Amino acid sequence: MTAVHAGNINFKWDPKSLEIRTLAVERLLEPLVTQVTTLVNTNSKGPSNKKRGRSKKAHVLAASVEQATENFLEKGDKIAKESQFLKEELVAAVEDVRKQGDLMKAAAGEFADDPCSSVKRGNMVRAARALLSAVTRLLILADMADVYKLLVQLKVVEDGILKLRNAGNEQDLGIQYKALKPEVDKLNIMAAKRQQELKDVGHRDQMAAARGILQKNVPILYTASQACLQHPDVAAYKANRDLIYKQLQQAVTGISNAAQATASDDASQHQGGGGGELAYALNNFDKQIIVDPLSFSEERFRPSLEERLESIISGAALMADSSCTRDDRRERIVAECNAVRQALQDLLSEYMGNAGRKERSDALNSAIDKMTKKTRDLRRQLRKAVMDHVSDSFLETNVPLLVLIEAAKNGNEKEVKEYAQVFREHANKLIEVANLACSISNNEEGVKLVRMSASQLEALCPQVINAALALAAKPQSKLAQENMDLFKEQWEKQVRVLTDAVDDITSIDDFLAVSENHILEDVNKCVIALQEKDVDGLDRTAGAIRGRAARVIHVVTSEMDNYEPGVYTEKVLEATKLLSNTVMPRFTEQVEAAVEALSSDPAQPMDENEFIDASRLVYDGIRDIRKAVLMIRTPEELDDSDFETEDFDVRSRTSVQTEDDQLIAGQSARAIMAQLPQEQKAKIAEQVASFQEEKSKLDAEVSKWDDSGNDIIVLAKQMCMIMMEMTDFTRGKGPLKNTSDVISAAKKIAEAGSRMDKLGRTIADHCPDSACKQDLLAYLQRIALYCHQLNICSKVKAEVQNLGGELVVSGVDSAMSLIQAAKNLMNAVVQTVKASYVASTKYQKSQGMASLNLPAVSWKMKAPEKKPLVKREKQDETQTKIKRASQKKHVNPVQALSEFKAMDSI
């Protein structure tokens, strides 16, 4: 390798290297290579028994090679004469091509006269190789001459940047900036052309990133230098100018290295390659676990697989221990890590049992499937953990900046330094979360863009802080304010680029699932803050809810831009509009009313139910958006947590599910009920459908509340479960087999009803509102009545009689009475739960819970237990295909970074 330092230009070129680094050289060389190869391969089958003679085809091919060589010589002469750089080398290369062309012409002619001669063929092959080498060297030299021209322009820009930085007065600064702008534009055009021709993707990305930094920072350097000249006593301006100058120097080096296709010294350029580390490790592990039993060796494979897995688990543990990871998510990650460990041991045991066999046994295949399922489950938990971080960190990203600027405008340098630390921590958190998202992503191009964006954000952070410090030193200076506004705009733009890049490598399904959970957490916090009269906590948490909702709307709307307009996009956008135009304004109104009521002295009364309903609608709105987005997903695309198989029979979410027994007449009462005639089954089904409506109301009511610390909800769920099992019995299903089982179940319901009655009466006795108290007592009386009815109806007599050779099943009337009694009881339980909540809230408002010695009844909101978000399509139903728009964005990984345009004026 030789380095030419003509005019201080660092030009690296190895004269012996024939490495082709650009697409242009390949395109120019390809026709000659094809012609020479065709000629060399003529009659390549060896000596022939046919009569020797002249080969017309070989002569034609030789002539075409000669003509192509002449064309290269003509162009080479022209390039050598016009080139300002490497003139001597180009002339020598042209002469070498001419010499090798003459040798090739002679060798090709001799071969064409005697194509069966192996000696003449060998001579021609050697001549062809020499000719191709000479032509390649000529093209590479011409290419390097273009590079040299670019480097000369780069040197002009580099010198101009230095002059701009060192300008002694504002007049000189203006002159230098005016002279530099067209030179930067000229360089950008040349670099863009070179970027398109580079073969290596990494070098293209490096060039694009460097161009983006150059275009963006030259105007900022002008502003920073101007501020230095006007306020030489403010150290922050000088620090900012030097930081920007350093970035520009790095950009110049990046363009130089990329143009010459040489390795970069900047480590940050190397980290962009490839997908995430954890994702790669998991993918590689999944490949490594599939081994031919014949070649399996425990000594070789066990240590290797265990070591790989422990490395993966170490990475997962780091993510689990991160500050933003929720406790429940941490526990799930730990559980999945243990499950993966166990699955690997089971798999290795199966491999040991299959060692030496030609084919894998079913047990081994099952162990492999289990292993891949466990790694898939671990992946899912890691993705959700990442989304926890993204959802929390990329929320209200401009708040730390606005607080910092406000302190700077007030001229309070002490506060600025304090808020600068908060801002720095916020920036570091964004970068950390972005890198976490990269670690679990398989999107190589997306990961590259995220890392480059994060790197630029990291470089921008100290510049923003310096701008704030400078403004704090001179708060009345118009230039200081303009300088701050410039950096504020740059920061917000870079955060948007990073946010979009992170969104691109994360799943919208994961984002919506996590956002739904976080909204629920915040809604509960809001309700608690309201009940505890915590005005600041209420206002802060409500702000987080608004921010999360706005982020969901933005992400989903952006995602819909990738689809052709249709029914799917209409449904999704309709759900987002409902949330943004109706639900959120109502929620904001309720929050403002609550804050105003609690802030007044004395505190004004507040309708908690209205507030809870408004909060609940926000959660429901987010959930509806998620359902709409998942509408086109196939079951295979959905996680287990997103999709549950919907059985033909509607069953309770709290009931125990059992497989149907073999239904043999006379074996059990349940089996007999299953043999009812279709007409009677239809009657029972009609009653069951009516019961299901009441059950769904109870499900909806109890699903609102967290049952930990709420005995009423626990009892309601228990009663619902038992009643569902009793109705299942009437259809020949469920865990209850005989009449005695049904009677026992009825007794359990009566016991639960008695406990609910006792608890409800305790609440009623302490309720200050007489109307609420009377309502609750009335519903409790209904529970006692319907429990008694259910106890009577539980003695279902199911018999099979043989009349005239036909089996006749009795017991339909008893079954229908049982279902009706269960339906009535279900309705009474629903009303009791509602009345208990209302009575509890009335009491809390009046006296406060602490002074009452009651069983723990905590009315805390809870997410509904999971329902199927998407119904399976029937096989015979036509499914509309949702096509991605033809204009779907396929953005070059660094295109966004290279599209910064220089400001026309400052």
UniProtKB/Swiss-Prot annotation:
There is a cross-link at K57, K797 (Glycyl lysine isopeptide (Lys-Gly) (interchain with G-Cter in SUMO2)). Residues 325-394 are annotated as: Interaction with alpha-actinin. Residues 864-894 are annotated as: Disordered. Coiled coil: none annotated. Monomer and homodimer; the monomer preferentially binds to CTNNB1 and the homodimer to actin. Component of an cadherin:catenin adhesion complex composed of at least of CDH26, beta-catenin/CTNNB1, alpha-catenin/CTNNA1 and p120 catenin/CTNND1. Possible component of an E-cadherin/ catenin adhesion complex together with E-cadherin/CDH1 and beta-catenin/CTNNB1 or gamma-catenin/JUP; the complex is located to adherens junctions. The stable association of CTNNA1 is controversial as CTNNA1 was shown not to bind to F-actin when assembled in the complex. The modification N-acetylthreonine is found at T2. Residues 97-148 are annotated as: Interaction with JUP and CTNNB1. Changing S652A: Abolishes phosphorylation by CK1. Residues 864-880 have a biased composition (Basic and acidic residues). Belongs to the vinculin/alpha-catenin family. It is a peripheral membrane protein. The modification Phosphothreonine is found at T634, T645, T658. Its main location: cytoplasm. Sumoylated. SUPFAM superfamilies: alpha-catenin/vinculin-like. Residues 881-891 have a biased composition (Basic residues). It is linked to Germline CTNNA1 truncating mutations have been detected in patients with hereditary diffuse gastric cancer (HDGC) and may play a role in disease susceptibility. Diffuse gastric cancer is a malignant disease characterized by poorly differentiated infiltrating lesions resulting in thickening of the stomach. Malignant tumors start in the stomach, can spread to the esophagus or the small intestine, and can extend through the stomach wall to nearby lymph nodes and organs. It also can metastasize to other parts of the body. This is Catenin alpha-1. GO terms for molecular function: actin filament binding; beta-catenin binding; cadherin binding; gamma-catenin binding; identical protein binding; RNA binding; structural molecule activity; vinculin binding. Residues 2-228 are annotated as: Involved in homodimerization. One of its GO terms (biological process) is negative regulation of neuroblast proliferation.
